From Swiss-Prot:
GO biological process, any: post-embryonic plant morphogenesis
One Pfam family of this chain: ALOG_dom
Protein's recorded name: Protein LIGHT-DEPENDENT SHORT HYPOCOTYLS 10
Record domain ALOG: where: 25-152
GO CC terms of this entry: nucleus
Spans annotated as Disordered: 1-31, 144-177
Organism: Arabidopsis thaliana
Amino acid sequence: MSSPRERGKSLMESSGSEPPVTPSRYESQKRRDWNTFGQYLKNQRPPVPMSHCSCNHVLDFLRYLDQFGKTKVHVPGCMFYGQPEPPAPCTCPLRQAWGSLDALIGRLRAAYEENGGPPETNPFASGAIRVYLREVRECQAKARGIPYKKKKKKKPTPEMGGGREDSSSSSSSFSFS
């Protein structure tokens, strides 16, 4: 049996004689999402090549996916609007949950660049997509009576050395500026 390090190494240095490594669940889902989005673009009239894809196509795709959603989102006129656990069924629509859409966009954003798309033109990284996701999150939180609370980032305390256990490590000199 090989160690995790050796298995990871075989991913990077795979020869033709070794069996292919099974992709992770995330990688499989990312590939499936990428193929689904590509098929969606091909089914447009006229078909849209990936090189001409814009954030508007992505927004249309997200709206298209709503029809397959499983999350009840009460409309403002519904008597259960704002109730986390309504006592009876209603006719409000089922939608894609915000968390599912957010995760989908994250995977498609990564897949776009992995498939040769330049980061500067990544339609999944557009501000319009972030605004749409924020609106969906807020709308669903109000409709279900569950306030969304953003998790606060922990600030490193000065006495702990900025949150690093070993400030002499080589990674401490690298920064994204």
